[in-house]
Each structure stands twice: as structure tokens, then as C-alpha cells.
């Protein structure tokens, strides 16, 4: 007798995001929110509307919680979040008071990973593997609460021993692992349903995503039950070029049209407007004003309540949301603004501490590129990426081309002057490649890449903290920082004060083995990678805010590190030049990163 064959139900097309959520999502589910550069924000709002006030106790995994995703906490629908970042990422990265008690389980339980390890677990889940090996987490406090549960340390295998080495005592006594002895094995993640916002889908549920694609399709492919998705447009069967389909219809439970379904985040459309499938679908940019309002409102109960009522708990759902935003605002998001140009050279005598720090970091990057065989620069968000951009432009003047990359999939980026957001779609225009997080953090960064990142705290052995402040409050998490320092030599860019340049960090979010330089407003501290030596001040320039300050005085006033020997003069940095300052200010005309005392001022 022939076995009855299994035919999955056809993808259902529903009228709106709320209907999609009602049809497929049930209380208590584990849901994943795909961070593809176009987070499914219309579906996040729909979750809040449909389940708000019902205590559904969802477990949510998502690469980052910021801006409109604050609705998850405000709606009280989440029991636990698995993430790599929670806070604000625009206009500058920093904590949001909505999450200050996260480490105490409020407003939900937290399971904190690095960006790459979260996606690697989804990759293992998608491939139905028992687990995956990672270069990240070893030596950091991020691994401590996961050992024996979702992360496991094993001795590195030895050639000629088919059964592997015998366990060693350090595996039970060193709770962070040792890079030269151990490997980390991570268990897979398999959400029940993954929520996606795509560019276009056909009536069978085949979905097109467009790079740079963040986590890519992995969260969708890891889903046990399948995917529910909003898209900008649904086209007939057979209308999509198969080479553009990223998520196959067999994985998709239901779809609906939600124009601007990623708002306030951006969506990029392939440059294929001549294809009928893409007709009427336009790239749109991040809505920075909306993101700022969401971030500023979230941590203040009265403002948060007003914001939530105005944009989330709308009886008319997504259609009413678009009406609230207005057609003029939405149309403006589809337009490319003019690039900023400075016609008059800047006077270096007007440089401030923030600008001086960024320029010193740019010099550090240039020196490393000229003296080592680095192929790329990984720009972490913040003053770090401003330094990387400035360095790349200065290197170009010297006839040296170096590719700047960022973790969400930008390769060979040339910044659009005037837009300082690291992940703006405007920076894709001249990229040489657009890819995803596994490609950048998993393959480009380990291959002769120079990392440049920020820090809330850095100690004199290079260890970095971005998780907990001096009062026990939550900061932001690792993001991709742990993944970067785990495989590449790294420069830290941070304005020095005694609460930031410390003897011992409160949480080793990113271990300091490969952190080779710390740059601040008055100089550059250096150390050798994989050494036991602390940072030493290697070059010096008086802070612009106090040009009479002595070297030893600056180190004692702004750090908890040992000052240099007064009998051995510290090499002086050359004065800031017209070219350096003009390039930097041209990149940041609104002075978001270059205003005096404005770099990470709200971190401890």
C-alpha cells in the first residue's frame, strides 16, 4: 500500500498584520524577530495590539531591541528576551532607562549573547545540527551563565586522537574557558515562528530580501512551524526571479502587504525597478526623528504611554499607523538628500575634545594600516566608526585604499557625507559588496581585519565592559563587539574619565587579549596583543579643553591607570590639521558625534 504523501498547506494571504498574528501566533510561543536590516516592525506592533493585556508570556529572540521594538516591553507581552543588544542606537549608541533593571529580570528575563553567536545558533537550528562551534565568548563573562545549558567548553581536538583528549581540570575550574586550550560548542535555536518583513513575495509565499541583510534568512529557516511575513508587495506566482528569492514559500505560513512595514527602520530594494515584480516598490530610509522620539519616550512612563497610544494601540492597525505618519513624511523617506560639502576649510584651533579623540583614533588606524597587512577595517558603531571613516578618507589622500566594513553586511563602504548613522542605506550606494552578519563577522573579521570599537568601560589590560554600570544597571550588551575582539586586533575609542578608564571592568563583555590600543581625547595608549602588559601612554597631546595640562596630570585626572614616568617624555602627537578636521566635520555636519562632551556622555 502506498504511503499517503504529505502536502503542506498553501501559504495564506491575509488582509493585514493583525490578522496574520491572530491566525498563527498563540500565547506562550517562542517567536523570533528577523533582523534583516528591515525588522518586522509592523508585526511587532501587531503582536502588542493583539496580545497586550493578556499576559501571553512570549519568549522573543531578536538581534537588537531599540526604537520601535520598545513596544515589546511597554505592552508587557514578553516573558523572556534572547538578544545581543538592548538600548538606543540613534542618534548615538547608549542605554535606555526602560532596560536599566534587565539584569534583575525587569521588564523581562534576559539571555544575553553576542550578535554573531545568536545568529550562529539560528544557523545550527536551520540546518538541524546538534550545535555549532564559535570563536566568540571565550574568556568573557557572557559565557558564564550559559555553561552546561546552551554553551559547552571542550578541549581542542588533537591530531591522531580519534576520541579527543581526556578532560582537563581547567574545564571545571576556569568558567570562561581559555582560547589556546578550548573550543565553545553552542546549542541551536529553533523558534516556533519567525516574523519577517520582506521586500516582495509571490502568492506562494516565496520572499525576496535585499542585502545588506543582517542575519539573512537564518532566523526564518530555523523556525519549526514556519514564517509569517509582511511585505511591500505581493505578486502572482512565477513573477519573481528565482535567484532573488531568499525564503522559500514552503517555510511560509502566511503573508500580508504592509507598506513601510519596516518603519521606522529602512528597507532597500534591488536596483531592478524595470522588473514588473518590483514596480512601485521603493527604497526608504530610516526615520531618524521617529527613532529619537521612540527612544526618548520609552524610559519615561508618561511619555511612553503617550507614544504607545499614538503609534501602537491603534484600532485601525497598520493602516491607521501610516495615516498617523502622513504621506508627506513617508514620501520624504524615499528621497535621497543632498550630500554635505564644506566649502571653507576648518580652523584646527577650533577643535574640541570629541573631535580630537576621533582624529587621534583615525591616526592610530592609519598607522596600523600602513605598518601591518590588514585587509579591512571593521567599524563599530559610535565614535569608532567616525574614526574609521575619517581614516579611510585620509588614507585615500595618501593613495592607500582600504575597505571599511560594518557588521550588518556593508563591505567597502564609502560614507554618505552628512548621514552619520553607521547602518544607513545611503552608505550602500558605493559599497563593493553587500552581504550579512555571518559573512562579515564570521569570515571577513577573522581574516586580517582591524577592529575599531567603543566602550563603556575599559581596563588597563584591554578588557571591555558594555553590560553593567557602577550601580548594577544594564548598559546595552555586546552587539558584535565580543565577536570582533575574539578574532581581530582592535582599537578602542572612548573619551577618558575615571569611571571609564578603570583598573578592573565590572563585566568582561569583550576580553582584552587582542585590544592593542585605547584612544582618548589626550593621546593613545598601547599594548601588545596576547601579552600580560597593561596599557602605556604612547603618544600625547593636551586636551583641547585644557591646553596647559601636563601628561601625568591628564592620566591621573581622567583614568585609574598608572601615569607615565615623568623622567621619560611621552612622544607628542602633531597638532590637528586643517585636512583632518575638515574631513571629520564634513562627515558630521549636525555635530552628533563631534559636539564637545557629546561622545558617550550618558554612559558611566
Which residues does each PLM region occupy?
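Active-site pocket-lining segments that scaffold enzyme catalytic pockets across diverse folds
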Residues: 369, 375-384
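Glycine-rich phosphate-binding "P-loop"
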Residues: 2-10, 31-33, 342-357
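Glycine-rich phosphate/diphosphate-binding loops that line cofactor/substrate pockets in enzymes
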Residues: 16-30, 360-374
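Short glycine-rich or small-residue beta-strand-to-loop segments that form or flank ligand, phosphate
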Residues: 30-34, 82, 376-378
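Solvent-exposed adhesion/ligand-recognition segments of exported proteins
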Residues: 60, 64-68
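Generic beta-strand/beta-sheet core signal
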Residues: 34, 210, 230, 378-381, ...
